């Protein structure tokens, strides 16, 4: 039986011409958090794919059956689909979607531009890994939810009410390779960093700046928390993203 998708959390697709953009949502989130940005990119004339990653936008139990292998495969397939019908393709991602975007730029040389929004691109420190391992060894399956880190009053992210630890472990393990290969990314990259982020530490963005081989532009978001695509700086996120994509993909 197919697991029902939460209302408003469906994938989004738009076909507008020979320039494409893949948009990727974050861990335990869903396309709803990226819908406004994806629609704005489409309105700017781009063909857009915003896939719902496996286990997301459905139920916590559904997510607990998935790993990085499932999420990255879906992202890669969406990029390949865009590449088949577009001359140039960029990737845009929030949080884990930023990590997935970096991963795609590492394994798909056709990536022409990257926009990383509060991305996770490195594993956490030893202390957090030890704590995670201890919880898993003790049979703990979930911890408190990490969604809705949003400064804007009244804004709520549609996400799960708990965080599955096996999925967290899978994400952290994948970040070892993503981080090690940041130096293979040659595509121009726009990094959007919230000054105050309670989910992803700022050293993730610092690694993008110091390790990515191609040119990196960093824009600080002064009035948003982690889910910047639903926060006070949404207008800046959209305008900076589209200006960057126009400058790189249309050149």
Region locations from a protein language model:
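Catalytic histidine neighborhood in serine/cysteine hydrolases
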Residues: 47, 206-227
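Short, surface-exposed "cap/lid" segments of acyl-processing enzymes
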Residues: 3-59
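Catalytic nucleophile-loop/oxyanion-hole region of alpha/beta-hydrolase
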Residues: 59-85, 90
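Gly/Ala-rich beta-loop-alpha elbow adjacent to hydrolase catalytic centers
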Residues: 93-97, 101
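Active-site nucleophile loop of the alpha/beta-hydrolase fold
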Residues: 115-125
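Short alpha-helix in the alpha/beta-hydrolase fold that links the catalytic acid
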Residues: 37, 187, 201-210
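Short beta-strand/loop motif that positions the catalytic acidic residue
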Residues: 184-185, 191-193, 197
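Catalytic active-site module of serine/aspartate enzymes centered on a nucleophile-bearing elbow/loop
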Residues: 223-251
């Amino acid at each position: 039986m197919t697991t029902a998708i939460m209302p408003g959390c469906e994938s989004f697709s738009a076909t507008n011409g020979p320039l494409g953009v893949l948009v990727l949502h974050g861990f335990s989130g869903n396309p709803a958090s990226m819908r406004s940005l994806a629609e704005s990119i489409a309105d700017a004339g781009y063909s857009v794919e915003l896939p719902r990653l496996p286990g997301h936008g459905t139920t916590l139990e559904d997510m607990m059956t998935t790993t990085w292998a499932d999420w990255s495969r879906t992202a890669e397939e969406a990029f390949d689909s865009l590449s088949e019908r577009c001359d140039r393709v960029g990737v845009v991602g929030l949080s884990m979607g930023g990590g997935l975007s970096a991963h795609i730029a590492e394994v798909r040389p056709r990536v022409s531009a990257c926009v990383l929004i509060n991305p996770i691109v490195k594993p956490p420190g030893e202390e957090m890994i030890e704590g995670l391992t201890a919880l898993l060894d003790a049979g703990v399956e979930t911890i408190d939810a990490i969604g809705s880190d949003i400064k804007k009053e009244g804004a709520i992210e549609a996400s799960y009410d708990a965080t599955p630890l096996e999925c967290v472990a899978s994400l952290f393990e994948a970040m070892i390779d993503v981080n090690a290969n940041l130096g293979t990314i040659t595509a121009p990259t726009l990094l959007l960093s919230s000054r105050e982020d309670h989910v992803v530490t700022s050293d993730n963005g610092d690694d993008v700046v110091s390790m990515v081989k191609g040119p990196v532009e960093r824009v600080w978001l002064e009035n948003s928390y982690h889910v910047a695509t639903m926060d006070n700086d949404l207008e800046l996120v959209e305008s900076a993203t589209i200006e960057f994509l126009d400058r790189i993909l249309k050149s």
